[in-house]
A protein has these predicted regions:
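Short coil/turn linkers that connect adjacent helices within long alpha-helical scaffolds
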Residues: 36-39, 75-79, 113-119, 155-160
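Residue register of alpha-helical TPR repeats
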Residues: 45, 85, 125, 145, ...
Length: 175
């Protein structure tokens, strides 16, 4: 992999672009309503949801613009699960903007917030996404560790997404 512009490792590609566009429109409207309402927790949640969809659509710069103004509330609300989703979305947007060094501590924050709240589903997702970012930096050993942690959590939860972690580990073995 190139150090200057590493390829994306197993990036999720939504199967239905039109459905994704509709979801973005719906969540954009929800985000605007929540922004006007002033509920900080609802805003952190709505920002994370919208940013995740934007990143899926390849609009990670827009995702980061949605998230950036709400970092302080996300920090203040770290005792609530949406904060963990917020930091995972933020780190993933940074990752796909090629700002992986900046994403690293944000992935760590997402995992720490999820662990503190015992929110295993988002912990597994953040670990899995972090693993992909590490592969993109040729840090395969660390990536394998994150994928194994994600897989263990997903297996314990009976999550269908455990198949994604298994595929990532198999792809790593082929590198």
């Amino acid at each position: 992999m190139s150090d200057t512009n590493p390829p994306e490792f197993m990036r999720f590609v939504p199967p239905d672009a039109q459905q994704l566009a509709r979801a973005i429109a719906t969540h954009s409207e929800r985000h605007a309503q929540v922004l006007r309402g002033g509920d900080a927790l609802a805003l952190v949640d709505a920002s994370a949801d919208l940013a995740g969809l934007l990143t899926q659509a390849g609009q990670q710069a827009h995702a980061l613009a949605v998230l950036a103004p709400h970092q302080a509330p996300a920090d203040a609300l770290s005792a609530h699960e949406p904060a963990a989703w917020f930091w995972c979305a933020y780190a993933t947007a940074l990752q796909y903007l090629g700002r992986r060094d900046e994403a690293e501590p944000v992935f760590a924050k997402a995992v720490a917030v999820a662990r503190a709240g015992a929110w295993r589903r988002i912990e597994a997702m953040a670990l899995h996404h972090w693993g992909r970012s590490l592969v993109e930096q040729d840090r395969v050993h660390e990536a394998r560790d994150r994928f194994n942690q994600a897989l263990a959590l997903r297996e314990a939860l009976g999550e269908p997404s455990q198949a994604s972690s298994r595929r990532a580990l198999a792809a790593l073995a082929a590198l």
